[in-house]
Amino acid sequence: MAPRSLLLLLSGALALTDTWAGSHSLRYFSTAVSRPGRGEPRYIAVEYVDDTQFLRFDSDAAIPRMEPREPWVEQEGPQYWEWTTGYAKANAQTDRVALRNLLRRYNQSEAGSHTLQGMNGCDMGPDGRLLRGYHQHAYDGKDYISLNEDLRSWTAADTVAQITQRFYEAEEYAEEFRTYLEGECLELLRRYLENGKETLQRADPPKAHVAHHPISDHEATLRCWALGFYPAEITLTWQRDGEEQTQDTELVETRPAGDGTFQKWAAVVVPPGEEQRYTCHVQHEGLPQPLILRWEQSPQPTIPIVGIVAGLVVLGAVVTGAVVAAVMWRKKSSDRNRGSYSQAAV
């Protein structure tokens, strides 16, 4: 999430459409990790539009600064990078102080490593309006404090987090942040969507297929794969005779493929011989209509068994003859050139 005053630098270039295909999001993720005896905590921040990372900051870099991760953001001018880098450095210092305070409030030893994570951002609907805003923190992998959906109140996870909650309430931080979410966060998101529209507003349809994996004589797994799709939002379901098999479906989380697209699978265990009663249904915004797939059994070989056996006999004879010939040639060659035999050996 960019600093509030950054929008003033960018406002002259905001000539954007009023409607969008689907909803979109802008997210700023941060992680501060203490490392006793090895200097200040390390701070890493990444920023995403939808499922695409486009900015990254690492305090351990040779020159700590906000770095572009997508070509479309490289067009921004020097002031943009100055502001985003300054914002990340300020957050890094704030989180380092917060880590020390939390260590003291939880009465923890300074010998151990601790982690403070944050996530801020906004979701925008197709009409360009705010769907939901976020501001939350976790300490050592557990919820600490978060802004509620009403954007007016906070949820504190424990008595220590309530100290932070009282501070936020005294400073009227929820109101300040709500103003940002409803205004500048959405404006920045619209700008990024426009500048990176060839990447961010694309819809790559999934390539889907069903794989068959026998488990035993009594069971087999049908796994429905969806590969190479963007954005990450997708729905995979299995049906048996038209009835959805929600309870019996194993579904993995959508995961990045490493090339800017995503992959996912859903599996069901079925009795042998009943595979054709099951259909996989794939829904994605890149598809003109949902895909419906069944397992396609590979055709059985049509070569007669007798022909196969005869062929193997002939092949065996050929191989045997070749081996005998090679040995005889090798022996003759050895008799003629004993001095060079070792160099010729494989």
From Swiss-Prot:
GO terms for biological process: antigen processing and presentation of endogenous peptide antigen via MHC class I via ER pathway, TAP-independent; antigen processing and presentation of endogenous peptide antigen via MHC class Ib; antigen processing and presentation of exogenous peptide antigen via MHC class Ib; immune response; negative regulation of natural killer cell cytokine production; negative regulation of natural killer cell degranulation; negative regulation of natural killer cell mediated cytotoxicity; negative regulation of T cell cytokine production. Residues 22-111 are annotated as: Alpha-1. Induction: Up-regulated in CD4+ T cells upon stimulation via TCR and upon HIV-1 infection. Forms a heterotrimer with B2M and a self-peptide. Binds a diverse number of peptides ranging from 7 to more than 30 amino acids. Peptide-bound HLA-F-B2M interacts with LILRB1 and LILRB2 but not with KIR3DS1 or KIR3DL2; this interaction is direct. The OC form interacts with KIR3DS1, KIR2DS4 and KIR3DL2; this interaction is direct. Interacts with TAP1-TAP2 complex and CALR; this interaction is required for appropriate folding and peptide loading. Interacts with the coat protein complex II and 14-3-3 proteins; these interactions likely control the anterograde ER-to-Golgi transport of HLA-F. Changing V346S: Impairs the anterograde ER-to-Golgi transport. Residues 296-305 are annotated as: Connecting peptide. Residues 112-203 are annotated as: Alpha-2. SMART domains: IGc1. One of its GO terms (cellular component) is MHC class Ib protein complex. Its main location: membrane. N-glycosylated. The keyword Nucleus does not apply. This is HLA class I histocompatibility antigen, alpha chain F. Residues 206-296 form the Ig-like C1-type domain.
